[in-house]
């Protein structure tokens, strides 16, 4: 029985093997009869990427990244490949507005797709052994096509790293508002 419990506690108690069920009773204030639900557990894949062709000639790839979750890089790559099959793409608009961030590894993987080489990001811990650097693998997969990244005050964390790395490597123009600013971000890339 959970009454007004924290979301993380409820979440942990409801997790279990796929295909098994959980009985859920919801009691509402000022309503005598509770609501009864039987919920079957399953894997839910969050769709973090949406895309479409834009522009007068439909030759710009618009990709909206809502967050950086476990499958964002695969979803992102699928969108790019579908664009390249349909038409000659002249550039990309990457929309990170209101993207709260997510998994650093996903931001690194997607950033790598647009860089020829070089450092994407480094993380520094209290100890020297906690310092890590992440580098792009050789090869810009979109072959230098222009990129515009849209950000706003809701763009945070991994989305700031993504936008910052593309800007530092002169691979993108950043448009919009200042980002959330939750990172201590400094650039070591050459100007």
Predicted regions located by residue number:
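A short, hydrophobic C-terminal helix/tail in secreted or cell-surface proteins
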Residues: 2, 188-191
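Cleft-lining beta-strand/loop regions that shape enzyme active-site pockets
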Residues: 5, 10-184
């Amino acid at each position: 029985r959970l009454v007004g419990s924290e979301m993380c506690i409820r979440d942990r108690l409801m997790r279990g093997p796929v295909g098994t069920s959980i009985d859920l009773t919801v009691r509402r204030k000022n309503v005598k009869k509770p609501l009864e639900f039987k919920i079957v557990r399953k894997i839910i894949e969050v769709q973090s990427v949406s895309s479409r062709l834009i522009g007068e000639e439909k030759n710009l790839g618009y990709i909206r990244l809502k967050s950086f979750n476990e499958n964002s890089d695969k979803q992102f790559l699928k969108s790019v490949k579908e664009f390249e099959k349909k038409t000659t793409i002249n550039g990309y608009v990457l929309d990170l507005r209101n993207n709260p961030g997510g998994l650093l590894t996903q931001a690194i993987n997607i950033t790598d797709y647009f860089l020829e080489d070089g450092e994407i990001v480094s993380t520094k811990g209290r100890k020297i052994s906690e310092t890590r650097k992440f580098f792009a693998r050789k090869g810009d997969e979109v072959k230098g096509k222009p990129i515009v990244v849209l950000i706003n005050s809701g763009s945070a964390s991994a989305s700031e790293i993504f936008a910052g790395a593309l800007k530092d490597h002169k691979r993108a123009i950043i448009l919009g508002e200042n980002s959330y600013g939750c990172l201590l971000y400094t650039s070591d890339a050459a100007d």
